Regions:
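C-terminal segment of classical bacterial N-terminal signal peptides
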Residues: 16-23
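Repetitive helical segments and hydrophobic/amphipathic motifs
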Residues: 12-13
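Bacterial N-terminal signal peptides that target proteins for export
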Residues: 1-9
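Generic cytosolic/nucleocytoplasmic N-terminal low-complexity/intrinsically disordered segments
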Residues: 2, 24-26
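Acidic/polar surface patches and capping/hinge elements
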Residues: 27-442
């Protein structure tokens, strides 16, 4: 159960002359179902989408936050602050954390921008100049006046409450030393960098919604002497080799695309496109991104709980090992993966988990899996086309085999865990009152 914070007495009373002029924007009663869909007719995305895009931008700047803090935490805190600020004014759903008494006539767009700015300034202090400059751009779009001033003040107070709630969640603790165990199946530091194991303390972070990091812990991976392991070993050895002759050009493009940007950023880009295409209202967008990024953050916590419970080796270690642990696998000491291997255990697979969680959220929110979209990464000059959320998720899953990063059992486990985490998050949060997105109020 999420303990909500009460902000009592934050709603200011507007002057009567402004009240009559702004009556169309009054906070609707919670039993009403209608939400105005003004975004589709607008020439630019609303502030929720614009700040989600800014979040993606500043989060990937090298050194923007400590390497030990998982980026999905920053995304979730920011989007929860935006959601609670917007919902507090429009009253179209249950708050996630802050039991809000929002100013009835305040601008929800100003509140969204202010909440995002406040959260990001605190979480990414090195990026404050860029964040504050973007905030001024937002205000130029929104306008000025008492409604905007109230929205700005309210968004700041809500975000500050969310930040205070997460200040002692364990994310700031230093990375835990991980000393690899010897023997077949055990994770070893991966070449070429042989960097220390990463995100070792993420499983100790307090989840946003899950009851514990191990609530949906993955089952043990297949035994090294099993037929499944041998089959998955052979698949990655063939398709994931750096100079593979069995991997097609399209499969190489898939591996290149999904390895070129953080997968949680890619799925926020998908959500941006879908939000525009489906004509979401501002409150729907606030709910969408809060549900998406909270699911991704709790997926990260669950993922690393499983990774460091089993500390299973990566293909680069398994395939080049002298002792394979299975008479039906044939190693190759000269084998290299198509892409350099991440510095954490292989099981479960992160791309599969995050992608399954994200696609589950998007299917649930929009009520359909069908959505045609394109994703381009100009850094590697690759564009991928999709006709469904699940199609993109499946491709992200396969990409890590083509890249030589994972075995199929890693990916299958990640998919199952991501689906379960997202389902739990959406079943227990973000209830709404008749408009689009997740589960209606019961």
């Amino acid at each position: 159960m999420i303990k909500r914070i009460a902000l009592v007495g934050t709603a200011a009373v507007m002057a009567m002359s402004l009240a009559m002029a702004a009556i169309a924007n009054a906070r609707p009663a919670r039993h009403r179902h209608h939400v105005a869909r003004t975004h589709a007719a607008s020439t630019q995305p609303d502030q929720v989408i614009q700040w989600n895009e800014e979040l993606q931008k500043v989060l990937v700047v090298p050194g923007a936050q400590p390497a030990s803090i998982h980026p999905t935490r920053t995304m979730a805190i920011t989007q929860i602050a935006v959601y609670d600020a917007v919902t507090g004014i429009l009253g179209q759903g249950e708050p996630f954390l802050v039991d809000i008494r929002g100013p009835r006539f305040a601008s929800p767009e100003a509140a969204a921008a202010s909440a995002a700015r406040t959260a990001l300034d605190a979480l990414l202090p090195s990026q404050q100049p860029a964040i504050d400059a973007f905030f001024q751009t937002s205000l130029a779009q929104i306008g000025s006046g008492p409604r905007v001033d109230q929205g700005v003040a309210y968004g700041q107070r809500v975000a500050s409450a969310v930040l205070a709630n997460r200040a002692s969640d364990g994310a700031a603790q230093p990375a835990l030393a991980f000393i690899p165990f010897p023997g077949p199946g055990e994770y070893q530091l991966t070449p070429p960098a042989l960097a220390p194991a990463g995100f070792t303390q993420v499983a100790n972070v307090t989840p946003f919604v899950l009851r514990s990091a191990g609530q949906f812990r993955a089952p043990a991976p297949p035994a090294l002497d099993s037929a499944q392991y041998a089959a998955d070993f052979s698949q990655t050895k063939s398709l994931g080799e750096k100079t593979s002759t069995t991997r097609t050009a399209d499969e190489t493009a898939i591996a290149t695309f999904w390895g070129a940007a953080p997968v949680w950023v890619v799925w926020n880009q998908v959500a941006d496109q879908a939000a525009v295409a489906f004509g979401n209202s501002v409150v729907e967008n606030a709910r969408l991104f809060a549900g998406l990024d909270t699911s991704l953050a709790d997926s990260a916590i669950a993922l690393y709980d499983s990774k460091y419970t089993y500390h299973r080796w990566r293909p680069i270690t398994a395939i080049t090992a002298t002792d394979q642990g299975n008479p039906n696998t044939v190693g190759d000491p000269n084998w290299l993966p198509f892409a350099n291997t991440a510095n954490d255990p292989g099981y479960p697979g992160a791309h599969a988990e995050f992608s399954q969680a994200a696609s589950s959220v998007l299917r649930d929110f929009f009520g359909t899996d069908r959505f045609s979209f394109a994703l381009t990464n100009p850094t590697v000059n690759v564009t991928r086309m999709f006709t469904s959320f699940s199609g993109a998720s499946d491709e992200a899953n396969a990409s890590r085999i083509f890249a030589g990063q994972h075995f199929q059992y890693d990916e299958s486990s990640g998919q199952r865990q991501g689906s379960r985490v997202a389902g739990f998050v959406l079943d227990h949060t973000f209830e709404h009152f008749g408009d689009r997105g997740f589960h209606p109020h019961r």
